[in-house]
Swiss-Prot record:
GO cellular component: bacterial-type flagellum basal body, distal rod, L ring; cell outer membrane
Lipidation (S-diacylglycerol cysteine): 16
Gene giving rise to this polypeptide: flgH
Organism taxonomic ancestry: Bacteria, Pseudomonadati, Pseudomonadota, Gammaproteobacteria, Lysobacterales
UniProt protein name: Flagellar L-ring protein
Subunit structure comment from the entry: The basal body constitutes a major portion of the flagellar organelle and consists of four rings (L,P,S, and M) mounted on a central rod.
Species in which this protein is naturally found: Xanthomonas euvesicatoria pv. vesicatoria (strain 85-10) (Xanthomonas campestris pv. vesicatoria)
Amino acid sequence: MSRLPSLSRLCLAIACSALLGGCVAAGDVRPFAELAPIVPVVAPVAQPTAGAIYAAGPSLNLYGDRRARDVGDLLTVNLVESTTASSTANTSISKKDATTMGAPTLLGAPLTVGGLNVLENSTSGDRSFAGKGNTAQSNRMQGSVTVTVMQRLPNGNLVIQGQKNLRLTQGDELVQVQGIVRAADIAPDNTVPSSKVADARIAYGGRGAIAQSNAMGWLSRFFNSRLSPY
C-alpha cells in the first residue's frame, strides 16, 4: 500500500480531531460571576456590668420594625427586570462613471485602420453597495432572592450580596445579586424591588443539559467569529 502524501495525512488528522472534538461535552455555558465569600458576623461578647441599669451594647427597639439595617441582617430582593431594545440600520451606496473619447483626426481626416477608428475609446464603471441590519432583544426576569447586608455605609446605605442555587433534574440554575440599597426604600415586609438597587449586578446562569443545548458548537462559533472568511 502506498503511503499517503504528507498533506493528505495532515488533513486526515485534522478531520479526526474535529470529529473527536464534537464528541467532547461542552463546559459551562455561562461561567458564574465570582462572589466574595459571605463572612459570618460574630456577635460581640457582652461585657460584665458594674451594677448600673444601662450598659453599652446591642440595643433592641421594642417599637420598631424588622427591616434590615445592620451588617448580617437579611433582606429579600424582588427581581422585577424587564428590558427591550431594538435597532435598525440601512445603508445604500451607488456610483457610476462614464468616459467617452472621440477618435482623433489628422488634417480633418480620421485615423483609421481597415476602416475602423482604432483610437476611439470609451470607459464606464458602476459600483454599488447595499446593507441592512435589524436587531431586537427582550429580557424579563421575575423572582426573589434573599441577600445578606455586607456593609453599612456612613450615609446609611446598605451593601448587599446573595445568591440562590437551584439543582434541577437536568442541571443547575444560579441567581446572584449584588448592589447598594437605600434603607428608606425597604418595605415594611423587609423587601425591596430590584429596580431600587443601585450599582446592581444581577447574574443568571446555568449548567447542565439545558444550558448546553442553547450553546453553539465550536464550528458554528468559528463561522460567527471575526476569523471566518465568509
